[in-house]
């Protein structure tokens, strides 16, 4: 029996490739989607989130890393995006204090350091795992069965 969780692996040779992946991902996202961005400091998580946010907003909005604010929100209604950096959280219950539990399911949520979510991580989330790959980055995209159709179109990114 095959694994129902689709997985795609990409090599991102340069920061421009990370930004391009962010633009591709922005076009695939829908309200209620959560993207978990996992990887070491400096691996491209914030860069990708910035590209997703700017692409969804349709303008070059300043998108600082939410390392100290923990959460930044952009847009409203169907265009609402939550960008969270959970590095400084010490307990999964703090997610509730941030309001993320309310945002899951209605807004697009981009979550850095998702391991801090514990069991609060949405089962339907798309996980992007970043790692160093020579001079570039390797990113593995893993999603629930809901992501299978969208991830099958990743070839459009890989060959663009």
Task: Describe the function of each predicted region.
Residues 40:
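P-loop (Walker A) phosphate-binding loop of NTP-binding proteins
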Residues 45:
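Conserved lysine of the Walker
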Residues 59-74:
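Short beta-strand-centered segment that lines the nucleotide-binding/catalytic pocket of NTP-utilizing
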Residues 35-37:
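Hydrophobic anchor at the beta1->P-loop junction of P-loop NTPases
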Residues 2-22:
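N-terminal pre-Walker A segment at the start of P-loop NTPase domains
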Residues 2-3, 8, 92-96, 101-160:
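Short phosphate-coordinating micro-motif centered on Lys-Gly-acidic
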Residues 26-32:
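Phosphate-binding P-loop
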């Amino acid at each position: 029996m095959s694994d129902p969780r689709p997985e795609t692996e990409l090599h991102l040779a340069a920061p421009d490739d990370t930004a391009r992946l962010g633009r591709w991902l922005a076009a695939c996202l829908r309200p209620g989607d959560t993207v978990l961005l996992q990887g070491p400091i400096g691996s491209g998580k914030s860069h990708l989130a910035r590209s997703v946010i700017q692409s969804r907003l349709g303008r070059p909005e300043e998108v600082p890393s939410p390392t100290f604010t923990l959460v930044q929100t952009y847009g409203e209604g169907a265009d609402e995006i939550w960008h969270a950096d959970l590095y400084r959280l010490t307990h999964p219950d703090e997610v509730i204090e941030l309001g993320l539990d309310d945002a899951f399911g209605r807004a697009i949520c981009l979550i850095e350091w998702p391991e801090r979510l514990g069991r609060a991580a949405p089962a339907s989330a798309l996980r992007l795992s970043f790692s160093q790959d020579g001079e570039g980055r390797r990113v593995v995209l893993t999603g629930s069965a809901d992501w299978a159709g969208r991830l099958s179109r990743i070839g459009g990114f890989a060959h663009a």
